[in-house]
Amino acid sequence: MKLLTILFLAITAVSIHAADRTTPGEIQTPYPTITNLAVEWRIDGDDNLDATCEVKFRKMGELNWRKGMPLRRVPAGNNQATNPIVSWTNRLSGSVFDLQPGTEYQIALKLFDPHGGEATKIVTASTRPEPIATKNAVIKSGSKTDLNSVQPGEVCILADGDYGAVSFNRDGEPGKPIVYRSTSGKAVFAEVSLTDRKWVYLEGVTVNGPVRMNGTEYCVVRRCTISAKFGIKAYKPGMLNGCIEDNVITGIRGWDPAIMGASGDNDGEGIQITGSGNVVRFNRVSGFRDCLSHMEDKDAMPQMCNDWLNNDINIGLDDGIEADFAMSNCRVMRNRITNCFVGISSQPGLGGPNYFIRNVMFNLTYSAFKLQRYSSGDVILHNTVVKAGDGFGNYTSEPFDHSLIQNNLFIGGKTSDATFGGYSPGRGRGVDVQQFGEHCRFDFNAYAVSGMPFEGKLRSWTFTKLPGTEFEPHGIQVGPDLFATQVFPDNPTKLYSPPDLRPRLSSTVADAALRISNVNDDFATLSPDIGAYEAGQPPPIYGPRP
């Protein structure tokens, strides 16, 4: 009997060790965008989740490698709170950020598991080129009667006038897009349908109604002025590899506390899409329920590798950016969000990683990050938030997990007892996050409180000073006077202009951030600064480029 027991224990130990060992599988680089690349490395095993993967990258033909952010460990899982239930595979996954368009890169991956299993691989992937007409494109003039006679490789310069409601019915080709362009902005449409089109670009027109992009591939909407209850829509089957950039999109909603929140009478979406590989950047969007939005539940196709970059967002009665149902490698970066109920929603993230980097948020009447419905895989880095109530508040009973929350600046503060849409902005803590999973990490964040004593709360643990706490070993408490001009939205019902939230060179957030390769390499002093900005550096462009 004793021998059998020993054998059983030995077999069990071997079995457990085998389950902890990592077996590398297939590597994919799905849906390259114009400036970012994704890597998905499927694995078997690693039940104890300690496998890591270092990343280096370089342009093809260059000698020197640059370090990337390590891939994130994504265990296989599912979300029982979605309809239908969504599942994801066991893998290491991540993004390489801010690359050159139309460029081939080598990505070197080094996998290591201390319990067994290691591999080194080099994969090649290319970013998409900027989606512009080719130099040898044929330029022709056109009016309403010419719209559906334009050929691939032609640019149709639209005459001024009223075009009514138009459905385009011709496709371009790879390298030969069809471009419809107004150089004056006076080609005016009641609405536009690009449904099921491929390689069609709409540029510089005015649309007093929706632009429909259902079923599109490689289509572009650029430098248009759109005024509508629903701006740009891409419902099932969604859009693939599209680009929506440099537009001004204005809705019908004002900054009205009576209609804020999920149950408010605030119907209307600025840019609402489903699909993968899309780039939504440098738009100015204001006056909607959700200014930028994914689709949810049964309305969502796979939403991977979508880039939401450098948008200027104002007056979102529910969410500034609704990144819900993002599956993996969606990137929400360098957006400015002002006067919204919620800044950014990830309700839920579906495995991830999904990245929220260097966004700036001011005057939010509920929360900065809505991580609900068991969101998984949110990576929240270098954001700046200034709001009445809790700086970072998350009050769900459906905890998020597998999140990395680092190098952020959260400023909360005194507020009245007012609620918005039935929800409170919080009591004024620097942070109040009530529930989160065992695989989350908070560290190197800075917290401040305006107009009341400092306090923070993580789970049931309340603290009145930093650093050296259980969940924030390197977090810091800072004063609210970090900026060149003292700013705080003490009246959330007021419509604020976006303030300058760059820190002073001598502020306590300077040089206090953790170094993260390919995320904060551009610091100019000893170390990166906490928050969205580096002190002394110009801010990025928000909204349409000159």
Predicted regions and their residues:
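Glycine-rich beta-solenoid repeat tracts in large extracellular/virion proteins
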Residues: 148, 165-172, 188-196, 209-215, ...
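Right-handed parallel beta-helix
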Residues: 159, 177, 181-186, 198-208, ...
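Solvent-exposed loop/turn segments flanking beta-strands in beta-repeat/beta-sandwich domains
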Residues: 44-57
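Recognizes extended acidic, P/S/T-rich segments that occur
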Residues: 54-102
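Acidic, glycine- and Ser/Thr-rich low-complexity intrinsically disordered tracts
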Residues: 154, 260-270, 399-546
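Beta-solenoid repeat scaffold
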Residues: 129-132, 137, 151-204, 217-218, ...
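Extracellular fibronectin type III
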Residues: 112-135
